């Protein structure tokens, strides 16, 4: 490991210290390493051709006109990306789905965009992780 020195303004350092304390880091270096790893992983997953994993979560109204069947159709159209899907009934009207995906990050992003853009889908979020060799 190498030691590096960085300069931070007072407000940013205070924010880093607060984050470190909330998340239980023993020191600033651990927090900065995790922040950097996260930024690098995010960058890697935005490149077409990168293989990885992702979790797509979203809430939708199951009674919305043909929405459930459109989502299923989209899932079948991209079946090679799907590892598993969890379906939860939140209340009488809403369902939460969580899909674990694996494949080319460009294809995963396209699939997520197709699902999230459907009318009646809310709170769509895609969390990507690059595949580590």
UniProtKB/Swiss-Prot annotation:
One of its GO terms (biological process) is response to nickel cation. The keyword Metal-binding applies. GO terms for molecular function: DNA-binding transcription factor activity; nickel cation binding; sequence-specific DNA binding. Ni(2+) binds at residues 76, 87, 89, 95. Pfam families: NikR_C, RHH_1. Binds 1 nickel ion per subunit. Keywords: DNA-binding, Metal-binding, Nickel, Repressor, Transcription, Transcription regulation. Its cofactor is Ni(2+). The keyword Lipid metabolism does not apply. Homotetramer. Belongs to the transcriptional regulatory CopG/NikR family. HAMAP family: NikR. NCBIfam families: nikR, PRK02967.1, PRK04460.1. Transcriptional repressor of the nikABCDE operon. Is active in the presence of excessive concentrations of intracellular nickel. This is Nickel-responsive regulator. It comes from Escherichia coli (strain SE11). The gene is nikR.
């Amino acid at each position: 490991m190498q030691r590096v020195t960085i300069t931070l303004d007072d407000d940013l350092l205070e924010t880093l210290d607060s984050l470190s304390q909330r998340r239980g880091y023993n020191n600033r270096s651990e927090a900065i390493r995790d922040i950097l790893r996260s930024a690098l992983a995010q960058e890697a997953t935005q490149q077409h051709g990168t293989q990885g994993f992702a979790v797509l979560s979203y809430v939708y109204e199951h009674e919305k006109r043909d929405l459930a069947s459109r989502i299923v159709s989209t899932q079948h159209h991209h079946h090679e990306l799907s590892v598993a899907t969890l379906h939860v009934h939140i209340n009488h009207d809403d369902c939460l789905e969580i899909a674990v995906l694996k494949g080319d990050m460009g294809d995963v992003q396209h699939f997520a965009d197709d699902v999230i853009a459907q009318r009646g889908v809310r709170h769509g979020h895609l969390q990507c992780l690059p595949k580590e060799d």
